[in-house]
Amino acid sequence: MDIKLFSYWRSSAAFRVRIALNLKNLTHEVIPVDLLKQGGEQHLPSYSAKNPQDLVPVLEHGSHVLRQSLAIIEFLEETYPSPALLPNNALERAWVRALSMDI
């Protein structure tokens, strides 16, 4: 399955998704979206069609388009359960979730 991540290098939300993709060893292509160039490439019609909120990240998984970093990470965890991003212990899972929100 082709995975494309539309990302900006300084976006903490996109960074979360890059971390998840790499921890899961998923082959993916990073498509840079410059949020500053010419008023922001995220406002171009071609990008707005992927995410009407004009935000990064966006993940294309085959023909499906996903947005919002935590929703993307949950999708990756459910679609590719191994290696797991979340521990089995409830307290440890809470710690990982809190840490992900700090990024």
Where are these regions (language model features)?
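GST-like domain detector, emphasizing the conserved glutathione-binding G-site
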Residues: 1-103
